[in-house]
Structures are given as C-alpha cells and as structure tokens.
Amino acid sequence: MKKFLLIISIAAGLVACQGSDQKAGKPLSQEEKDKAVNDSSNFTTIQWLDSTVKELGKVKEGQVVEVSYRFKNTGDRNLIIQNVSASCGCTVPEKPDKPFAPGEEGTVRAKFDSKGRPHGEARKEVYVNANTKPEQQHILTFKVEITD
C-alpha cells in the first residue's frame, strides 16, 4: 500500500511539472520561442494592463517618443513573446526575451522616430506574437500628431 501511494505521488508530481522546462526569467532562443508558440499545450492567457490604443499627443517632427504597454500573464503556463514587429520602419519595438511566469507582469516598448514623417496625425501599430489563447497575435496601436 505504501509503495502504491509512493508511485501515485511521484506520478502526480511528474504530471504537475510538465511544461515547466521553460524557466521564467531565463532568456530563450528563437527556436524555443517558435516551439512554444506552435504547441497549444503551452498556451496561456494575457491581460493588457494599459489600453492597447494610446494617444501620445503632439510630437515635433524629428522627435523620438517611446510608448509602453504593460501586460500580465493571467494563465497557468509561462508566457513567451515570440516576436514583436511594427507596421513601418519608423517604429522600433523592443521584444522581451525571457518567459513570464503565471502572474508575472512585463512591458512591451516601442520607439517612434518622427524624423522625415509628414505632418499631421500618424497611426502606428505594434504586433505582438505570443503563446496565448484565444489569439496569438495582439495589435497595439498608438497615435501621434506630428507638428513643425
């Protein structure tokens, strides 16, 4: 009986630890990120703590501004940001390299360079691909008004 309980305990421990091979806090290779995003057993959920649409106001042509979007891993698996890209070359996003443990918060940042951009309103998008459900791609938007 004791042997049976020991075997059951070990089996339960192994099942509980499945999927924990990606340690939160340790940077992952692009191959590891790609694998996690393509394996639905590793999917988690994300909550954007800030609005996903931001109004940055007036920006003088030539000025560089930074925008940040905070998020929280609300699932039960590590959150892995596979890729972060922008709608044009004037916006350079910064991709977090490490996984985020359940309950952990993080930030996606992007810099917008208004140099040489036409005056008036500009709307830019940042695309975040992650191992999330129900959607794997998240669109973050910011608006600026470029002035003299």
Task: Give the positions of each predicted feature.
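C-terminal motif of bacterial Sec signal peptides marking the signal peptidase cleavage site
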Residues: 13-16
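Terminal connector regions
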Residues: 23-24, 120-147
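Beta-sheet-dominated interaction scaffolds and their linkers
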Residues: 22, 28-68, 146-148
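Asparagine-centered strand-capping/turn motif at beta-strand->loop junctions
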Residues: 71-75
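Positively charged n-region of N-terminal signal peptides that target proteins for export
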Residues: 1-4
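Surface-exposed binding patches on compact interaction domains or structured appendages
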Residues: 76-102
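Short, surface-exposed loop/turn segments at beta-strand-coil junctions that are enriched for proline
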Residues: 113-119
